[in-house]
Amino acid sequence: MFQPREPDKFEAALHRFDEENSRDPNHENNQPRELLYARRLTGWVLRLCPDAAEELRLAARCQHICRWQIPRSSYPMTRPGYLKWRADLKKFHAQKAGDILREIGYDETVIRRVQDLNLKKNFPDDPETRVLEDALCLVFLQFQLADLAAKTAEDKTINALQKSWQKMTDDARAEALKLDYGPREKILLQRALNG
C-alpha cells in the first residue's frame, strides 16, 4: 500500500495542484476542465501502476497545471506553431509544479524528478515516463477522441490515433481496446490500427 514519505506534504501538494486547476475558466461536466483532466490522469496512472511512486503520482496530478493560461490561439496556427506551443507548455507545467512543490518544502531531488516526468525526459526508456505517457494516451482515447473526431478531418484524427498508439505499451493498448467508444470512434480507431 502506498505511503507518502511525508503525508502532510503530499496532501498539501495535491491540494495546491487541484486549487490551481480549479481556477480553469473552461468547464466540462460542470467542473473546471484541467481539474477534471488531472483527476482522470491520476486515475489512469493508478490503474496502470497501483504502486506508483510519490513522484509519479505528483506528476500525474500537475501534468497540465494551469494549461489554459497559454492558449493555443496565442501561437501561429501552423505545425511549427503547434509544436512550439506544446514545448512551451511542458516547460510551463514543470516550472509551475516545481514552484508549488518548493513552496510546500519538497527537496530538490523530488522536484527535479517530478519535472523530469512532466517533461517526459528519457521517454521511452524510463518506466515511469512510460506509465505517464500511457495514461495520457488513455485519457485522450477515453475522454477526448470523440470531440477531436467531431471537429477534425478524418485523416488528421487517424494520424493522431496512430501517433498515440505508437507511443503506448502493450498493456495500455489492451486497456484502450476495452474502452467504450462511440460508433464513429470505433471505425476511426479500426482504420488507424489497420492503416
Kindly give the residue locations of the regions a language model identified.
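Residue-level detector of well-ordered alpha-helical segments, enriched
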Residues: 37, 52-61, 93, 110-114
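Helix-adjacent hinge/juxtasegments
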Residues: 73-116
